[in-house]
Amino acid sequence: MALGFLVYLSYTPRIKGNIPAFTPETYPIIGSYKFFTHKLSFWKAAQRASKNGMFSFWLGKNHVVGVSGEAARKMYLENPAMDHIKGVILIGHGPDYIDGRKTKQHGIWLPVMAGNKSYAQKNVLNCQKTAELTKRLPKVTNDVRKAFESVASQGFIINPARMCAVLTWDTATRVFAADELIDVPENRAKLLYYLPILQKTSSCHLLSFPWASYFSLPYWKRKYGREGMRRLVTPIVEARMRIIDPVRADDPLQTFVDNGDSADYMINFLISMIFISAANGCVVSGAMLYSIAHHPELQEKIYQEIKAAANQYAADSSAPLVDQLDSLPVKAWENMSETIDLCYKECIRMWVAFPMGRMNEGTTDIKIPGTDEVVPAGGLCCYNTIDVHYSEKLYPEPLKWDPARFGEGRKEMEQEAHGFMGWGAGRHPCNGIRWAKIQQNMMLAYAFAMYKWTGCHKDGSPNTDFIPPTTALNELAPSLPQNLFLKAEPRK
């Protein structure tokens, strides 16, 4: 017993400063393992047990401060010492190497470009300029149209989660990467094999067991997924750099090559951005189609808004609606439907709710507003968006799918700073928001222009039971909704 106690003391570091009290759900050696396995219940229990909504917990030898409430949320999002790249170690999924000790941060993420931007941030923003998106529209609209035309070959019954996820990956890859990854069937098959591995595999548990890296299946799966993506994109980048033919490709990768970017930076950008650009969109897109299909009044309202936008912007307003969509400019896709925008915010609020990671990279402690407690220098800090997105005050009946809460006359979330965090907030807003909204508008526009949708079972029999999009709240990594099916009725 004495030996075990000495081992425990030697394993647990001393923390200086007036930190929040430790949550009762802390166990020797492993720490608060329910942070991984029961994200929602762990967070709520820790809040209830704390005196002010702030608490400490261990993940192995890693001390983490959990914060909640408006003032702490504002500090978390706006303090310049809170680094989101170094804090990603608390997330545990995606293509970046995380072994439980540190995240290996590539140079594409360092803020060394003009305006304190990173190479990755600069390219993401450039890819979404109107001139660039205009060049991508013909291929991405063709991808979306072909995908929904294929619904007929599936007996007009689809799993919206799977179909929309694939479409999200396809179109995001065109906008931020290279056409060969989608146009060459072998490349696309590999892409659609590796991306789900990276999407749903979390090695966050290695924070508690860093010594177990080489015995961890998720750790090796993430390395396998990352290496697979590297082997996929590297030959494409290298081939582009050798081409001197005046007839050149016209996609983002070619722009990077023409700019003289290094192969290493381009390869790492493609690997990371193909994943990141669709990480949440691939989950939310299917939830959007599913949710609206179960609300026929919203579906009809959106259909009418799509028709109005097409009539205003299409090259030939007398053409069939789906043909009108093929000719729409970027401006039309950005202003497609106010109702879609409300639904999008509600789906994001309900589905994209998860712990966020930051590291206090400063040399001094950060005081938590409204308390005498601190986030220690060099320490990890976590905020779970369920604190705001499932707040009874900001979102009455938070488990109810209610897009109207974002409309005029409601907007209860505006009572507090950063009351909606669906697009990031503070110092780190989402850089890909423009494309994300266009992409979602595009998928739903073609879906509703071509069909009326209703809920069904796998065999096509009617199913009017609506399952609000809350099932991912306890999962280690975002995953696609399961066992949801829709039936499409072609519009006349």
Curated annotation (Swiss-Prot):
Glycosylated residue positions: N116, N335
Biological processes annotated in GO: sterol metabolic process
UniProt-annotated location(s): Membrane
Pathway: Secondary metabolite biosynthesis
Membrane topology listed for this record: Single-pass membrane protein
Cofactor: heme
EC top class, as a word: oxidoreductase
A single MF term (Gene Ontology): oxidoreductase activity, acting on paired donors, with incorporation or reduction of molecular oxygen
Enzyme Commission code: 1.14.13.-
Swiss-Prot/TrEMBL keywords: Glycoprotein, Heme, Iron, Membrane, Metal-binding, Monooxygenase, Oxidoreductase, Transmembrane, Transmembrane helix
Coiled coil (residue ranges): none
Domain of life: Eukaryota
Induction remark: Expression is positively regulated by the cluster-specific transcription factor MYCFIDRAFT_198930 and is up-regulated during banana leaves infection.
Residue ranges of the TM segments: 269-293
List of residues binding heme: C430
Cellular component aspect of the GO annotation: membrane
UniProt similarity note: Belongs to the cytochrome P450 family.
Cited function: Cytochrome P450 monooxygenase; part of the gene cluster that mediates the biosynthesis of an emodin derivative that may be involved in black Sigatoka disease of banana. The pathway begins with the synthesis of atrochrysone thioester by the polyketide synthase PKS8-1. The atrochrysone carboxyl ACP thioesterase MYCFIDRAFT_190111 then breaks the thioester bond and releases the atrochrysone carboxylic acid from PKS8-1.
Protein name listed in UniProt: Cytochrome P450 monooxygenase MYCFIDRAFT_204672
Natural source organism: Pseudocercospora fijiensis (strain CIRAD86) (Black leaf streak disease fungus)
